[in-house]
């Protein structure tokens, strides 16, 4: 992968009118919650939706563009991410506003917990589950994030997005094509904001529901570790953690990566993990679960980027 400076020079003049920040060769370990992985060739932090649209129109389609939010659900490989990584920041995409008696509009970089807090302030029930999800709205929309039996799709009215050419699209709930931890909306779309619908509720009842979510999370999840959240989706009819535990993988280590002793569907960086450590651990767990029960676990964490040149990659990687 060539340097970010080289890429910017090739596009000299095309990006001069942007108001956001362009930073070449930025370590993704500073962005992701795992604190591991190689660099983004160029990191772009747009000022707002208009600035992002201008950027998309200016960058040739053959140049890769990858969008990330607050980095909670990402595993970046050690060879880095070619092209541009777009990170939506709180300044331009992190606001949440009450737009009617029962509706909230949130930017794609708004932390899930901030949406829960705004709903509490507005007296709207149905958003308490976000209080326990370590992520942002963009990721929640893309993967239909959920917890405690509630999912994002239950609250979405419409989603605003930009396509690769910088054109605006407004998607209805049906357009998002939601399923368990999945949206079938085009992967080329960049979500910029969402309109939610809640139901009026009592402040104390909403607050109690949020407190219960927080207590549960702190009791059973390694919230103070470097982790990306749930590693694998729950298979039909069972829980990922149960299958991982039955396969003897609780506490399993590869290098500086470990399956949490506290919650074995959470992978943690104990301090020295590389992207390869983390991915190899995850694939080792998948292989052992398949061998033990015949169940194929599917990654919930998004893996991206290149393997480091010359890096020894285990033969089973990606087979399951």
Curated annotation (Swiss-Prot):
Its main location: cytoplasm. The active site is at 181, 230 (proton donor), 300. It is found in: Cytoplasm. It holds the Pfam family MurB_C. It catalyses: UDP-N-acetyl-alpha-D-muramate + NADP(+) = UDP-N-acetyl-3-O-(1-carboxyvinyl)-alpha-D-glucosamine + NADPH + H(+). PROSITE patterns: FAD_PCMH. Residues 35-216 form the FAD-binding PCMH-type domain. Keywords: Cell cycle, Cell division, Cell shape, Cell wall biogenesis/degradation, Cytoplasm, FAD, Flavoprotein, NADP, Oxidoreductase, Peptidoglycan synthesis. It is an enzyme of class 1 (oxidoreductase). Cell wall formation. This is UDP-N-acetylenolpyruvoylglucosamine reductase. It comes from Brucella anthropi (strain ATCC 49188 / DSM 6882 / CCUG 24695 / JCM 21032 / LMG 3331 / NBRC 15819 / NCTC 12168 / Alc 37) (Ochrobactrum anthropi). The gene is murB.
């Amino acid at each position: 992968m060539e340097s970010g400076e080289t890429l910017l020079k090739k596009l000299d003049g095309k990006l001069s009118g942007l108001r956001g920040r362009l930073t070449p060769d930025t370590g993704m370990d500073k962005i992701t919650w795992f604190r591991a992985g190689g660099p983004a060739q160029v990191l772009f932090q747009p000022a707002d939706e208009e600035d992002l649209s201008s950027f998309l129109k200016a960058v040739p389609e053959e140049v890769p563009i990858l969008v990330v939010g607050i980095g909670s659900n990402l595993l970046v490989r050690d060879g880095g991410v070619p092209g541009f990584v777009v990170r939506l920041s709180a300044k331009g995409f992190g606001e949440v506003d009450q737009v009617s008696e029962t509706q909230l509009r949130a930017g794609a970089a708004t932390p899930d917990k901030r949406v829960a807090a705004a709903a509490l302030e507005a007296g709207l029930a149905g958003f308490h589950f976000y209080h326990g999800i370590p992520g942002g709205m963009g990721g929640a929309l893309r993967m239909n994030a959920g917890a405690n039996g509630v999912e994002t799709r239950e609250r979405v009215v419409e989603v605003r997005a930009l396509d690769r050419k910088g054109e605006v699209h407004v998607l209805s709930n049906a357009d998002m094509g939601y399923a368990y931890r999945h949206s079938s909306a085009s992967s080329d779309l960049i979500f910029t904001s969402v309109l939610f619908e809640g139901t009026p509720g009592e402040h104390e009842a909403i607050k109690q529901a949020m407190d219960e979510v927080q207590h549960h999370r702190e009791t059973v999840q390694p919230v103070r570790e470097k982790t990306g959240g749930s590693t694998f989706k729950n298979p039909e009819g069972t829980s990922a953690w149960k299958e991982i535990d039955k396969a003897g993988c609780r506490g399993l280590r590869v290098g500086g990566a470990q399956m949490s002793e506290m919650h074995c569907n959470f992978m943690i960086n104990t301090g020295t993990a590389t992207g390869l450590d983390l991915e190899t651990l995850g694939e080792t767990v998948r292989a052992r679960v398949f061998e033990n029960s015949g169940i194929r676990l599917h990654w919930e964490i998004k893996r991206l980027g290149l393997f480091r040149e010359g890096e020894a990659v285990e033969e089973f990687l990606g087979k399951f």
